[in-house]
């Protein structure tokens, strides 16, 4: 496994570990908050029980100690019934007192003279009593509506808090499950890379067919290149034959001869002065096709030059896997396509491509 792969895998593991720690922290905070809310609600209920027990003789507490006060719920129904009866008595008494108060208020004039109301059967007394009853009912309805509204708000807010907590817990659970899946995938990746390093990877039928197709395609490209070389050599042979046949019938072309000698001298000088023959073998120049061919180790490199710039780079190697050869070809074309410095390309290849199995990085 390469250092880059190991560092990447270690980075994945660190990210998963940090995410797991954050998820555990959030889950713990939610549980702590829920426990705090539960204890707070129990404390409020406990204080309410104590207050009811202290202020209401109908509720009899069971005192175990000073810190724990409990109420027997079996006696609540009887106490509530007694309390309702007492409330009715108080209500009647209150109404009588309020009626009497209103009666006196409306029947006494500014000059302290009593109005002519003989008894409670008087129509004016009945009307005033009815108005008092209506006001009382309206006030009670208003208070009951407020109580119902407050109860509804409390229930709604409590439901929202519970739903939010449940949603957070569900999200934490999903994230935890996702983290577990990530760990599983990371372990599978480590196993796959270990198996790959050991060279024990078995290719599936589809991938094996693809590799064979790439190999056949590589051979076809090499065949086309050899055909092109053969065509160039055949054209050169024909040209030389024509020159030889016509050499006895006409004066020699001094300009062509001079160009030929100059080309051979430049070719020889470049091979001797600029090429490291310990690394580069079989250097050939093809001016007619604009190509340069040489071999490093077991790989043949063909550089196509068009308009003083490299237009294409081809690699041929029967011993190198087709996928690695394709990757090296793509990398070289990506690096040097369009450049005019052929020497820099050759130097790079001799230094980086001396071992054909290693891909270019």
UniProtKB/Swiss-Prot annotation:
Top-rank taxon: Eukaryota
Keyword match Zinc: no
GO process terms (BP): homologous chromosome orientation in meiotic metaphase I; regulation of meiosis I spindle assembly checkpoint
Keywords tagged on the record: Centromere, Chromosome, Coiled coil, Kinetochore, Nucleus
Broad class of where this protein is predominantly found: nucleus
Subcellular location: Nucleus; Chromosome, Centromere, Kinetochore
Residues forming coiled coils: 126-160, 220-246
Nucleus is among the record's keywords: yes
InterPro entries tied to this protein: Kre28
GO cellular component entries: kinetochore; Knl1/Spc105 complex; nucleus
Description of how the protein assembles with itself and partners: Component of the KNL1/SPC105 complex composed of SPC105 and KRE28. Part of the ten-subunit outer kinetochore KMN network that includes the KNL1, MIS12 and NDC80 complexes.
Role noted for this protein: Acts as a component of the outer kinetochore KNL1 complex that facilitates microtubule-kinetochore interactions and the spindle assembly checkpoint. Kinetochores, consisting of a centromere-associated inner segment and a microtubule-contacting outer segment, play a crucial role in chromosome segregation by mediating the physical connection between centromeric DNA and spindle microtubules.
Protein family membership: Belongs to the KRE28 family.
Name by which UniProt lists this protein: Outer kinetochore KNL1 complex subunit KRE28
Source species taxonomy: Eukaryota, Fungi, Dikarya, Ascomycota, Saccharomycotina
